[in-house]
Amino acid sequence: MDVTSQARGVGLEMYPGTAQPAAPNTTSPELNLSHPLLGTALANGTGELSEHQQYVIGLFLSCLYTIFLFPIGFVGNILILVVNISFREKMTIPDLYFINLAVADLILVADSLIEVFNLHERYYDIAVLCTFMSLFLQVNMYSSVFFLTWMSFDRYIALARAMRCSLFRTKHHARLSCGLIWMASVSATLVPFTAVHLQHTDEACFCFADVREVQWLEVTLGFIVPFAIIGLCYSLIVRVLVRAHRHRGLRPRRQKALRMILAVVLVFFVCWLPENVFISVHLLQRTQPGAAPCKQSFRHAHPLTGHIVNLAAFSNSCLNPLIYSFLGETFRDKLRLYIEQKTNLPALNRFCHAALKAVIPDSTEQSDVRFSSAV
């Protein structure tokens, strides 16, 4: 039953003698402006929107994403890779993690171009393309969240166990950790895919994205468990900072070192939360008995909502390089030196130096650079 119609019916019964209104016009502006917002939040409200209206809204959001976020994500992640590789002799342990994170984000940003033009979720109609896109997205999604989780743990080790972690926090161990994270991301995707594919070999319309067991794994392993670990790490870090309150000379430097990682994690949480809520709502709904397998896809039932949450998830990969550039003091210094080496225009060099320094005052202070590189 329509929530809006039910509410109006209750209101009329409270006032006897009120004439019954005419049948509601499903194309009235009032319904179309108010109801979709509620429906999008509940992943259940695009029923009153016509196909044309859903297309217009999706096209508008896709244009905003393509104009404002996609260039930042594509150029920014490439810039992170180029600058850090150019200064590989000065590469720190956090730089290794951010390079791998930039690789995963760059792949997701490139993949987002398909989603931007997939306004009707049409590629979910093709089983092979649907499965390929789901595998491609999950591998890089897992790698992003796993890298963020490991970076939070590494940050806690660097701050809380600074004197005892010199043997553990080495570049060799960092490279080994990156390799294991990529292997874990691929395994978390391919192992469930192999298992469920053997069970659905006879289904012509089988898509990896529609398997409920895979969706439960994505929500738990790709969102709930990692952020529980991240929350624990940051709670321990806060306790360390509180204990170091009397060391006023170290506290500002440590807060600057934490600001970048904390911002990246918060942006990831905000961007990926709608996607996981959308999937969770679908998982909590009971499957209709006798429904055709191809028609049970929640993205078929709610294409506009699925499009919105996908764009929100892709936005994380676009915002990560922006946060990294603005809050990473070591990276800004490398970027300034890279521009000076590659250009012979003194005016441009002075402008870039002033712009990078204006982001956070005293960002080029040598003591802060040494501290940021150390952690």
Swiss-Prot record:
Q: Which residues carry this modification: N-acetylmethionine?
A: 1
Taxonomy, top ranks, is: Eukaryota, Metazoa, Chordata, Craniata, Vertebrata
Q: Which family does it belong to?
A: Belongs to the G-protein coupled receptor 1 family.
Q: Where in the cell is it found?
A: Nucleus; Cytoplasm; Cytoplasm, Perinuclear region; Cytoplasm, Cytoskeleton
Keyword annotations: Acetylation, Apoptosis, Cell cycle, Cell membrane, Cell projection, Cytoplasm, Cytoplasmic vesicle, Cytoskeleton, Differentiation, Disulfide bond, Endoplasmic reticulum, Endosome, G-protein coupled receptor, Glycoprotein, Golgi apparatus, Immunity, Inflammatory response, Innate immunity, Membrane, Mitochondrion, Neurogenesis, Nucleus, Postsynaptic cell membrane, Receptor, Synapse, Transducer, Transmembrane, Transmembrane helix, Ubl conjugation
InterPro entries, per the entry: GPCR_Rhodpsn (IPR000276), GPCR_Rhodpsn_7TM (IPR017452), GPER1-like (IPR047143)
Sugar-bearing residue positions: 25, 32, 44
Gene responsible for this protein: GPER1
Q: What else is known?
A: Does not bind estradiol according to PubMed:18566127 and PubMed:16645038.
Q: Which GO terms describe its biological process?
A: adenylate cyclase-activating G protein-coupled receptor signaling pathway; apoptotic chromosome condensation; cell differentiation; cellular response to estradiol stimulus; cellular response to glucose stimulus; cellular response to mineralocorticoid stimulus; cellular response to peptide hormone stimulus; cellular response to tumor necrosis factor
**Ranges that cross the membrane:** 63-84, 97-120, 133-153, 176-194, 221-236, 260-280, 307-327
Q: Which residues lie on this side of the membrane: Cytoplasmic?
A: 85-96, 154-175, 237-259, 328-375
Report the PROSITE patterns cross-referenced here. Answer: G_PROTEIN_RECEP_F1_1, G_PROTEIN_RECEP_F1_2
Q: Which PANTHER family match?
A: G-PROTEIN COUPLED ESTROGEN RECEPTOR 1 (PTHR24226:SF2), G-PROTEIN COUPLED RECEPTOR 182 AND ESTROGEN RECEPTOR 1 (PTHR24226)
> What is the protein named?
G-protein coupled estrogen receptor 1
Q: Which domain of life is it from?
A: Eukaryota
Query: What does this protein do, in the record's words?
Result: G-protein coupled estrogen receptor that binds to 17-beta-estradiol (E2) with high affinity, leading to rapid and transient activation of numerous intracellular signaling pathways. Stimulates cAMP production, calcium mobilization and tyrosine kinase Src inducing the release of heparin-bound epidermal growth factor (HB-EGF) and subsequent transactivation of the epidermal growth factor receptor (EGFR), activating downstream signaling pathways such as PI3K/Akt and ERK/MAPK.
Q: How is it modified after translation?
A: Ubiquitinated; ubiquitination occurs at the plasma membrane and leads to proteasome-mediated degradation. Glycosylated.
Assembly and interactions?
Answer: Homodimer. Heterodimer; heterodimerizes with other G-protein-coupled receptor (GPCRs) like CRHR1, HTR1A and PAQR8. Interacts (via C-terminus tail motif) with DLG4 (via N-terminus tandem pair of PDZ domains); the interaction is direct and induces the increase of GPER1 protein levels residing at the plasma membrane surface in a estradiol-independent manner. Interacts with RAMP3; the interaction confers proper subcellular localization and function in cardioprotection. Interacts with KRT7 and KRT8.
Q: Which residues lie on this side of the membrane: Extracellular?
A: 1-62, 121-132, 195-220, 281-306
Q: What induces it?
A: Up-regulated by EGF and TGF-alpha in endometrial, ovarian and breast tumor cells. Up-regulated by progestin and by phorbol 12-myristate 13-acetate (PMA) in breast cancer cell lines.
